[in-house]
């Protein structure tokens, strides 16, 4: 499997924010989002066996992230091996690939309105940028809680104002999120 890094840190986003986890970051993605810096930011991947990955996971919760984890051919086998080792598996995905096996928690972060979500999920995380409209955000609710996170960069202040406005208008559909790990200077 193509792994960029494995590390322990607090979950900085969503329902499990503040929980200690082991993160397994995979390389590669099936999308080509213009704003993505995944390859530049995280560097080169190394091939790792499922056994080596499982051995490096020390926390109860293991978060599979990326890039896009669902493009890894052996993902289902890794999930089952982690579960057999008594880990709770969480997946962070763009949602464009089918998942037909059990994962304890799935967070979908759709990257553009043109991509259709093909998996069942527990929560949605949307980065509120100048390109995201309220109508697009509402289309992702589908009965699940949607976490709205501000966009870093020059649009940050406007992003925070937009989030507050949307939550005020739809308090049962949206929650404000942050990247808590950045606040604590954690990875």
What are these regions (language model features)?
Residues 71-187:
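Conserved AdoMet/S-adenosylmethionine-binding subsite of the radical SAM
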């Amino acid at each position: 499997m193509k792994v960029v890094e494995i590390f322990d840190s607090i979950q900085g986003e969503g329902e499990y924010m503040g929980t200690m986890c082991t993160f397994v970051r995979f390389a590669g993605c099936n999308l080509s989002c213009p704003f993505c810096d995944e390859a530049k930011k995280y560097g080169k991947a190394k091939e790792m066996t499922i056994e080596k990955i499982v051995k490096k996971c020390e926390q109860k919760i293991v978060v599979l992230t990326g890039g896009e984890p669902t493009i890894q051919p052996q993902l289902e086998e890794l999930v089952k091996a982690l579960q057999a080792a008594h880990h709770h598996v969480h997946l962070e995905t763009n949602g464009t690939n089918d998942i037909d096996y059990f994962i304890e928690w799935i967070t979908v972060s759709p990257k553009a309105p043109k991509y259709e979500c093909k998996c069942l999920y527990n929560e949605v995380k949307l980065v509120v940028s100048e390109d995201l409209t309220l109508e697009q955000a509402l289309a992702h609710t589908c009965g699940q809680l949607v976490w709205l996170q501000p966009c870093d960069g020059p649009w940050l202040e406007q992003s925070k104002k937009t989030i507050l406005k949307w939550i005020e208008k739809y308090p049962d559909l949206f929650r404000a999120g942050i990247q808590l790990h950045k606040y604590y200077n954690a990875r």
